[in-house]
Regions:
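Short-chain dehydrogenase/reductase
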Residues: 1-94, 105-118, 123-124, 300
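Amphipathic alpha-helical dimer-interface segment in Rossmann-like NAD(P)H-dependent oxidoreductases
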Residues: 92, 127-149, 163, 190-191, ...
């Protein structure tokens, strides 16, 4: 482990770290020297229903290569005994938990934008809620007793949108509920954790260039701008590293309690903590969506980077 990082000696659990934001968050915590337990359902031996090639073993290796200690633990966070065993293992091996990141989702294949609630299969909609809400609750139930043993613990709920942006309906009822619940969890758990000297926040990336999104646009991280021809709004997208750096900055902030209960965005936090995306810019996707996409303003995307 890198003993020089700002998070050296700290222990993190990133639940849902197989790919996308979760993977990048785990790696950035590792860059700062943390020991990071990474969980997910897709391993080198078995794929989840999402059917993507990325694995949690790869994520753990990336964490270690970045300077931390990555530990992969295959876990289905809807299976309570698996989550209980996970937290007991962290306790047994480390005796502490400093950062819990709930990035559990894996429901992209279930989203039906543009359909009325009653037009969506009930089991399909409820599965989305289980993957994106129940999993967060189960994980918090078992992990927070370990987190609160020491003052300074941090819970990060990863979602899509802030309390401001999610005031508007997100087109699909099940998706709307799934992505609003983590905002309420951060608020409620922030209140409950405060007496233990711990903090809870919700963090959202902007237009995330996840592996799945890059595949959707037929591009790679190296030539992602070619996707702008298909979707102009893709110009304001951000790499997963950006939100990873946001969470790492929060975890290393001795005054992180100032954010307790709040919903935050990667773009907002970049202006506070001074980090950038991999290309040196600071994408502010939510302001772009508000002013350009929804507001009808004509603008150069460079104004929002």
């Amino acid at each position: 482990m890198n003993g020089q990082g700002r998070l050296a000696g700290r222990v993190a659990l990133v639940a849902g770290a197989t790919r996308g934001a979760g993977r990048a968050i785990a790696v950035q915590l590792g860059t700062e020297g943390a020991t990071v337990y990474v969980t997910g359902r897709t391993t080198r031996a078995r794929r989840s229903e999402v059917d993507r090639p990325e694995t949690i073993e790869e994520t753990a290796e990336l964490v270690t290569a970045a300077g931390g200690t990555g530990i992969a633990v295959p876990t289905d966070h809807l299976e309570r005994e698996q989550v209980r065993a996970l937290t007991e293992r962290v306790d047994r091996e480390q005796g502490r938990l400093d950062v819990l990141v709930n990035d559990l989702w894996g429901g992209e294949h279930l989203v039906d934008f543009g359909k009325k609630m009653w037009e969506i299969g009930l089991e399909r909609g409820l599965r989305m809620l289980r993957l994106g809400v129940e999993s967060h609750i189960v994980t918090s139930h078992y992990a927070l007793p370990l987190l609160i043993r020491r003052p300074g613990g941090l819970l990060v709920e990863i979602t899509d949108g802030t309390t401001e942006t999610n005031k508007d309906y997100r087109e699909s009822l099940y998706y709307d509920l799934t992505k609003y619940a983590p905002l309420r969890m951060a608020l409620g758990l922030g209140t409950e954790l405060e007496e233990y000297g711990c903090t809870a926040v919700a963090v959202t990336p902007g237009f995330l260039r996840s592996e799945q999104m890059l595949d959707h646009f037929g591009v790679t991280e190296a030539n992602w701008r070619d996707g702008v021809a298909k979707e102009p709004g893709f110009a304001i997208s951000e790499s997963p590293v950006f939100v990873g750096r946001a969470v790492a900055a929060l975890a290393a902030d001795p005054d992180v309690a100032r954010w307790n209960g709040q919903s935050l965005s990667s773009g907002q936090l970049s202006r506070v903590y001074g980090f950038t995306d991999t290309d040196g810019t600071r994408p502010d996707a939510w302001r772009y969506i508000r002013e350009v996409t929804a507001g009808g303003r004509e603008a150069d995307d460079a104004e929002y980077r």
